[in-house]
Amino acid sequence: MNKTENLSIEETNEIREKLGMKPIPVFQEKNTDHKESLSIEETNELRASLGLKLIPPQQNFNSSPPNVHNTSKIDELREKITKFQKKANAPLRMAHLLEETNVNDDSSWLENMDAIPSSHESKRSSTLPRKGATKEDENIDLHNVQVSYNIEALSPKKDTILTLKESSIFDDTDSTEVLENVKAAEENADREKLRLRQMNKDRRQKKKILNVSSLDIEEEEEGEKHSITTTHLIIGAEQGVMKAPNTISAKPPTGKVKVNFDSANNMSDEDGGDFKPLKIKKRKIKDPRSTKARKSKITDKMEIVKLVDEDESLSWMEEEQPVTIINPRTSSNNELKGPEDLAREIEKARDEEKRRTESILKMREISNSIVVDEKVTFLNTLDTSLSERSATENKVKVHGEGEKNIGDVTNGHTKEGSGNNTLTEAVNNEPNYEGDAENAPNFFSGLASTLGYLRKKSVFTTGDVDLKPGKDVNNSESLRRDVRNKEHTGTGTYTKDKLHGLEQFTSSDSSNANTHSKRQDHYDPDIKLVYRDEKGNRLTTKEAYKKLSQKFHGTKSNKKKRAKMKSRIEARKNTPENGSLFEFDDN
């Protein structure tokens, strides 16, 4: 069984104090006349009757305990204050070699490690003030902080929050800590930015001519900072106004002369700031005595070139296809043609027309096709009774005087006699279309309607539909080959390199043609391939390639597909009509 011990409040408070806990407060009972006060024995009797725990008897119950709670709280606060002071006083830079270390510095913790007591009581006694200590001893650990404002600048009505001023961590100098109002500092910086921006705007709009550079502005800002730091408050152990240090200006060395140049005139482009004055270079005016007259170069006079028509020598082109060059430009130098020249030109035109008609007649006699020229005379040779006659019938009509007119009625050709130019009887005896005037043929309405009518009457023989297109391709290839093999004659000058290139081209072309002909020596378009399986059954191209791919990849079809293919092969065996499709013709 565990034993239970009852402790009094005083004992409990002693234990709690050793553990650093808050003691239990003890309240004294006030003696009231109108209420009965029971002793501990009477209270225990009542608690025993109620089944409650008895109160142990206590000695000196009314005596007040010592004020231990207040002393422990003060000690804790002092410890915290000393810790914060040590952190604030710790230097941010490393100590130099020849610099003496302070006892409170963090750099001297190795030297003073044995001197600092390790026990909690000795530490508390060292931090707590002594009874006989003076005010100077108490203010040793307090830290002096400077304020960047005077007493007049700080308004007593408004609360101001001061924070440490930002400083660079790379600054090796012993910079003192300064408190400032963040809002006021930001307002001053914004006000300065607005002022500089307005100055820049005025400079661009040429309202002001500023002889101020960015270096001058930086010097002005440094001067303002120096003036602020010279007169500021001190908060800490010694409160008051710090006086400006008396700095002795360095005397210039004797025996030397110092020359100060004008900074505005001798300022380089790199050192010049945003507000550098604009410099406009004056235009250099040359001496009129030294100027030389510019000589104008006159071009050579253009000679008149006589134009030579090279096409006049090509007489064979004039016979086959005369070319008429129309020059719309009229020149005053052209002389007026006389009547003899005009008569000569008219006679020449008549001769050309006569020669043309004779050539057309010769073409009609030689060929069996219709020759269409620019005249309408060939339309008179057409007969409207073509449907009543056969497509290959030719009639010979004899004139009363004995002269013959031979006409090919099917193709619409006529041959005129030497005596009289009379039309054939077939043309004169035109049938009358009185019933349907709309369906009557009209050869003079256009060439398209005439050709359409001739197609309807089966005058034109159309090509066979059953002919293979391969023959046309072969014909076109033969024509191309003939054209390629023709030797083109022409006049021109070639260099040695060009001639060598042409010879190589012709030799390569002939070699390619020979190789192409050799490849096609064994070509036979009538060969037919027959595919058979291992059992000798005929297969189509698709089935044969499918079997080859399955054999190559090592796969096979399922039972359903194999049965379907087998039934298809059996059905093909039973049909004797397809025998000629898969075998060679014996004939």
UniProtKB/Swiss-Prot annotation:
Keywords: mRNA processing, mRNA splicing, Nucleus, Phosphoprotein, Ribonucleoprotein, Spliceosome
Chain segments carrying region Disordered: 403-423, 471-526, 547-587
Ranges of biased composition (kind: Basic and acidic residues): 478-501
Residues carrying Phosphoserine: S268
Localization terms from the record: Nucleus
Bias kind Basic residues: ranges: 548-566
Biological processes, Gene Ontology terms: maturation of 5S rRNA; mRNA cis splicing, via spliceosome; mRNA splicing, via spliceosome
GO cellular component, one term: spliceosomal complex
Protein's job: Component of the U4/U6.U5 tri-snRNP particle, one of the building blocks of the spliceosome. Required for pre-mRNA splicing.
Family: Belongs to the SNU66/SART1 family.
Subunit structure: Component of the U4/U6-U5 tri-snRNP complex composed of the U4, U6 and U5 snRNAs and at least PRP3, PRP4, PRP6, PRP8, PRP18, PRP31, PRP38, SNU13, SNU23, SNU66, SNU114, SPP381, SMB1, SMD1, SMD2, SMD3, SMX2, SMX3, LSM2, LSM3, LSM4, LSM5, LSM6, LSM7, LSM8, BRR2 and DIB1. Interacts with the pre-mRNA-splicing helicase BRR2 and the ubiquitin-like modifier HUB1.
Protein name: 66 kDa U4/U6.U5 small nuclear ribonucleoprotein component
Organism, as annotated: Saccharomyces cerevisiae (strain ATCC 204508 / S288c) (Baker's yeast)
